[in-house]
């Protein structure tokens, strides 16, 4: 992926962009789902390690259909942008979301867990695995926009609990 930096005018927030390029994610192949998880989670982990309240990370996905086989963990001060022609497909069995806030082995109370997370766009296909597509708990400032969540069975599309300032 590539990394660039830009500045925003509102509240002096700066942004660093991670653009996952064409060819970095696999649409087909025996190991496509696990390879895709590695690429995407590496971008999320870079944001986890470097993003701050005034230096946030924006991650962009290319157009295409990309399978994953485990839950992706997004962290504070990260914005995820998917084109309307981008689809994430969860191949894992029940118990795996497509994305959730952080690592739930971390214990949080009230709203002190994760903050400033935005997800914008894309199609999110759960393939009827019995889990929710997105899961967030103990967050502040969560925004989810322009998403199309499909093929949910016996679960919520989005699960958000103990979230202060939620916009869907």
Task: Place the predicted regions along the sequence by residue.
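Internal alpha-helical scaffold/solenoid segments in large eukaryotic proteins
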Residues: 62, 78, 142, 150-157
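Short, T/G/N/S-enriched strand-turn elements that build extracellular solenoid repeat scaffolds
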Residues: 41-50, 67-76, 91-92, 107-111, ...
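N-terminal extracellular ligand-recognition/capping segment immediately after the signal peptide
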Residues: 31-37, 53-104, 124-130
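Extended beta-solenoid/beta-helix repeat architectures
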Residues: 38, 76, 113, 140-145, ...
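All-beta strand scaffolds that present successive hydrophobic residues in beta-strands
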Residues: 61, 80-83, 114-121, 142-146, ...
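C-terminal segment of classical bacterial N-terminal signal peptides
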Residues: 2-9
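Right-handed parallel beta-helix/beta-solenoid
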Residues: 10-41
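Glycine- and acidic/polar-rich repeat regions and solenoidal domains
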Residues: 95-114, 124-136, 150-160, 165-167
């Amino acid at each position: 992926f590539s990394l660039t930096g830009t500045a925003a005018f509102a509240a002096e927030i700066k942004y660093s962009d991670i653009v996952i390029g064409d060819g970095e994610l696999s649409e087909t192949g025996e190991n496509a789902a696990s390879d895709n998880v590695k690429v995407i989670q590496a971008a999320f982990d870079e944001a986890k390690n470097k993003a701050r309240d005034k230096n946030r990370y924006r991650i962009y996905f290319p157009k295409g259909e990309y399978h994953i086989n485990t839950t992706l963990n997004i962290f504070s001060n990260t914005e995820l942008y998917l084109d309307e022609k981008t689809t994430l497909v969860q191949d894992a069995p029940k118990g795996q979301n497509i994305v959730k806030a952080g690592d739930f082995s971390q214990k949080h109370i009230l709203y002190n867990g994760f903050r400033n997370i935005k997800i914008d766009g894309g199609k999110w296909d759960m393939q009827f695995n019995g889990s929710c597509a997105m899961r967030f708990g103990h967050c502040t400032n969560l925004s989810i926009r322009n998403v199309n969540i499909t093929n949910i069975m016996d679960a919520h599309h989005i699960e958000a609990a103990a979230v202060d300032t939620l916009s869907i």
